[in-house]
Amino acid sequence: MKVNNNIKTTLRVAKIELNSMFYSPVAWLVLVIFGFQIGMSFAEVFGDQLRYQDMGYELWQVTTGIFTGMRGILPPIQRYIYLYIPLITMGLMSREYQSGSIKLLYSSPVKNTSIIFGKFLSMMVYGFALIAVLGVFVLFSAITIVNFDYSLVLSGMLGLYLLILAYSAIGLFMSSITKYQVVAAIGT
């Protein structure tokens, strides 16, 4: 019974955090910029593959070239995702400290673990939204490429999701040790 209440509390905290996250323009702006960056990279790499085909070159390992190759779209995402995640995680706990609502949370029957897991769960959902943006381009590629390598792309997406979660955990930690959002973002 007690575990069930902790899970309900964690889900309630995650829902509140997701609502506040998506009411702010920062989460939407990061999502749009992330999608734009992926779209530009994908259009360039996919266009190169089409030009090679038009010039009569034999195409091989198209999935590798588009997604994980030297000019693929997953390596730049891995290099730049650390710029996006701190913008979201910087306010997870810092907002609570600045507004003074952290005192209310500590005095309520909500446990610290439920607060932290709820905030991390909201970042898991946001990370899934980022991966869903990438999934649109993966779906387009799966439809247009004849021998699409699903295992390569899905394992790359899983790795990217886990990287987002690792950065989210670091950002949540940095946000919990300082009440200033800028310090939390720079520390992440």
How would you name each of these model-derived features?
Residues 1-84, 88-91:
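Hydrophobic alpha-helical transmembrane segments
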Residues 31-34, 184-188:
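Central hydrophobic cores of alpha-helical transmembrane segments
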Residues 38-43, 61-79, 118-183:
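Secretory targeting signals
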Residues 45-55, 95, 99, 146, ...:
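Perimembrane helix-loop junctions in membrane proteins
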Residues 87-106, 120:
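Transmembrane helix boundary and interhelical loop/hinge segments in multi-pass membrane proteins
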Residues 113-117:
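Alpha-helix N-cap/helix-start motif at helix boundaries, enriched for small hydrophobics
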